[in-house]
Amino acid sequence: MTQYTLKQAGSLLQSKQISAVELASAYLAAIAEKNPALNGYITIDQDKTLAEARAADERIAQGNASALTGVPVAYKDIFCQTGWRSACASKMLDNFVSPYTATVVQNLLDEGMVTLGRTNMDEFAMGSTNENSFYGAAKNPWNPEHVPGGSSGGSAAVVAARLAPAALGSDTGGSIRQPASHCGITGIKPTYGTVSRFGMVAYASSFDQAGPMAQTAEDCAILLNAMAGFDPKDSTSFEREKEDYTRDLDKPLKGVKIGLPKEYFSEGNSTDVQTALQNTIDLLKAQGAEPVEVSLPQTKLSIPAYYVLASAEAGTNLSRYDGVRYGHRAAQFGDLEEMYGKTRAEGFGSEVKRRIMIGTYVLSHGYYDAYYLKAQKLRRLVADDFQTAFARCDLILAPTAPSAAPKIGADTSPVETYLSDIYTIAVNLAGLPALTLPAGFSGGGLPVGVQLVGNYFAEAKILGAAHQIQLNSDWHGKRPE
């Protein structure tokens, strides 16, 4: 019962072939069996889950259900939810039970979706491996010696392991797309401002965007329909007409121009990634799409620009965690200043501290112009590159990561880890939508994904192209043994 896609589960619930309680119970049993080894979930509450499932069954019986009523979903631990611990995988918030619910979570609760639990992540969404979690690293379900990616590693892992039909993630520099690639699932980062950020713990406010993670592009489209929409509580939310993100799913690819950035098809990619890209190009050409070469020359500048800007925003956003109002507080201190220092030293992990220090430095007097202001100018150049490319193509095909998932505990420096985000970060700098879908496997049996990037608000076009690829391939249908 836990092998269904989100769409299949919804159809079976609506036709009353299964009940929401039966489906939730099946997932809870699978979670109890497999999660201790996987560590994909960090908070589970069976009583709350089954109460939501019973309410969904009542709604279905009364005939006022939506297509998602009764379908289970997992939430990355970055989304606040009333009555649930919302820790952001940090010691700083280990005892924080949210008094309110994020808008995007409320949207899904309003549809009648059933909460399975809270998924593991890199602390405050800072990381690419899920090893920065206070609760220990989540494992890759294809090989537990490897990382699931990050920062939405737990969400990717539970969907791949069939411990949830879908999950919510957030993407600041690739945190939906990179773990989706490493775990062999589909995930989309929408255009910045499409999904409300209210109630999503802030890392870098001008980059953060929530998105769906599921087995298929079709599932992501269905879920995004419920997630997206204007929210007056979020000042960065776009006020636009409600879209149907499933509208292009059946649209053929004949004549669609697919941009291939020459800077992304480089020697830096593993053979497995090159093969996955070629597999996808061949599938697109077979369906009538037209590959065209494009150039994104500022790609090499995206890493330094991103880590300056995101760290600056993180340093500001995380200043609120001081031990005064909520969260961790040092047990012993002499005065207020010592309490601040000890609380933050104890409450934050090493990667979070590193980024706060970088952010404080680049915003300090004498360095603002040299680093922060220059990075903002680079951000504009990166965005302009994409607009030049989209003048020649409809969508861009690119790698998601240079290789398959690395091993847990791999001896890599922070800079080496940052460089693994080379293909995802530029999209966040520009605020564009992008989707990762499975496209093959490494020689070691690990999934490899590729990404489709679209222009602003082209989510339906991206999802349609991905769906057409998945209709003609079965990488998304593979699951770990």
Swiss-Prot record:
Query: What is this enzyme's class at the first EC digit?
Result: ligase
State whether keyword Ligase applies. Answer: yes
- Catalysed reaction, written as an equation: L-glutamyl-tRNA(Gln) + L-glutamine + ATP + H2O = L-glutaminyl-tRNA(Gln) + L-glutamate + ADP + phosphate + H(+)
Task: Output the Pfam families linked to this UniProt entry.
Answer: Amidase
Q: Which GO terms describe its cellular component?
A: glutamyl-tRNA(Gln) amidotransferase complex
What PROSITE patterns does UniProt report for this protein, alphabetically? AMIDASES (PS00571)
Q: Where is the active site?
A: K76, S151, S175
Q: Which UniProt keywords apply?
A: ATP-binding, Ligase, Nucleotide-binding, Protein biosynthesis
Which molecular function GO terms apply here? ATP binding; glutaminyl-tRNA synthase (glutamine-hydrolyzing) activity
Q: List the EC numbers from the record.
A: 6.3.5.7
> What GO biological process terms are annotated to this protein in UniProt?
translation
Q: Which segments of the protein form a coiled coil according to its record?
A: none
Against NCBIfam families, the record matches this protein to: gatA
Summarize subunit and interaction data from the UniProt record for this chain.
Answer: Heterotrimer of A, B and C subunits.
Q: Which family does it belong to?
A: Belongs to the amidase family. GatA subfamily.
What does the record give as the function of this protein?
Allows the formation of correctly charged Gln-tRNA(Gln) through the transamidation of misacylated Glu-tRNA(Gln) in organisms which lack glutaminyl-tRNA synthetase. The reaction takes place in the presence of glutamine and ATP through an activated gamma-phospho-Glu-tRNA(Gln).
Q: What is this protein called?
A: Glutamyl-tRNA(Gln) amidotransferase subunit A
What is the originating organism of this protein? Neisseria gonorrhoeae (strain NCCP11945)
Which gene holds the coding sequence for this protein? gatA
